[in-house]
Amino acid sequence: RQFGAWYPWYAVIVLTLAATISAIDRQVLALMIGPVKRDLQISDTQMGLLLGAAFATLHTLASFPMARLADRYSRKWIIAGGIFCWSLLTAASALAHRYSTLFLARMGVGVSEASLPPAAYSMMSDYFSQKQLPLAVGIFQSATFFGVGFASFVGGPLIQHLEMQPALVVPIVGDMYPWQAAFLVVGLPGVLVAVLAA
């Protein structure tokens, strides 16, 4: 299949944005361990399960069927749908007032984020020659490190700023903890990336 000279690199930019958002969504919870434990009154073990099993186990298991789907159906729509789902689920974590609700949301994020790597690598292998492919893959893979670094650099001050603000009251939802507001801030921009990927 032939592509315009610009389109493959546009795809790499969008995929890299998606991978960056994915890394930020994964990392943000680790920056809010104290407030989440305090407000949900959960133990270290429960927090460890949120950070590990809730996301990693489902992410790993979902990678296999996601790869199968990427072979059979439109990779563009699989990626866009995955970004949309994990972004909404990250934002929906802002509504969690119970441990079980947050646990389920993180499970959903893990499953949704499993859609990106297999579809992205398959897409890039079609878009680029063997000579160009390593550069495209390298750019895409750098997103994880950039996302983690960005989350640490910006997320800490953001959460500290939110902690200093008066209680946030959202219509229908009610009072919102600062860490819940942080989930909204990092989750909603991903919806725009999903639109770019579609």
Protein language model features and the residues they cover:
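Cytoplasmic helix-loop-helix junction between adjacent transmembrane helices
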Residues: 104-144
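Conserved MFS/SLC helix-loop-helix module at the cytosolic interface between two early adjacent transmembrane helices
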Residues: 61-100
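Cytosolic juxtamembrane N-terminal segment immediately preceding the first transmembrane helix
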Residues: 1-24
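Membrane-interface helix termini in secondary transporters
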Residues: 35, 67-68, 157
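Residue-level signature of mid-helix packing/kink "hotspots" within the transmembrane helices
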Residues: 27, 55-64, 114, 148-149
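Helix-loop-helix hairpin linking two adjacent transmembrane segments in secondary transporters
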Residues: 140-198
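Helix-breaking motifs and short loop linkers at transmembrane-helix boundaries and internal kinks
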Residues: 41, 74, 95-101, 112, ...
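Extracellular/periplasmic helix-loop-helix junction of adjacent transmembrane segments
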Residues: 30-61
